[in-house]
């Protein structure tokens, strides 16, 4: 079990971590992973910072936690096997093939390929706890679907996924934790009906959000404009849909 100041993440479940940009999602994951010291966090009942018994059971991967640029894919497997007590070499090689990762230095991979390698590394580590910080960034549609498929295959491990795509991953999650001024957490079914995702031009999203006056749980810039998650649990959905339609949002 993982306990922080605001949340408790139960063992064996897949947890979504959502919140506005800059709220501290990555920092929280780094604290859980023992990379940053924090007095308010316990993992398996112990402080994770500089605690090898915890660090051997927890892995954090994401675009902000890159692997060394000079390492080739083969070396990653060698290092992983040396570092992680329960490293699964067969699973590592299997997923490299499934994600069609080229045998190149990490530095020469595309952003999506780096995301895939980080995810593969986390899965193959055999760690009981996987912390995935927006692990899908840069993945094309085909590999994104494969990513979700592999997550389903790993169900039963404790996973915390920081995401801007709550509606997209909702079917994989057991719980959601929302970071903010008033943090809340609970089963996914209690949240999903009241959390709405709006997409469209950035200026229209900003104007609509101000008019609605509802909390924005996260914002993300996309090639077509932006995406925002709105906490509408305390509001009627009809005015929201009318406002979204008026601003040309989806």
Task: Give the positions of each predicted feature.
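Conserved beta-strand
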Residues: 1-13, 39
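Short, conserved post-Walker A segment of ABC-type ATPase nucleotide-binding domains
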Residues: 15, 26-35
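Conserved ABC transporter NBD signature motif
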Residues: 34, 38-54
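ABC-family P-loop ATPase nucleotide-binding domains
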Residues: 53, 60-117
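Helix N-cap at the start of a conserved alpha-helix in ABC-type nucleotide-binding domains
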Residues: 141-143
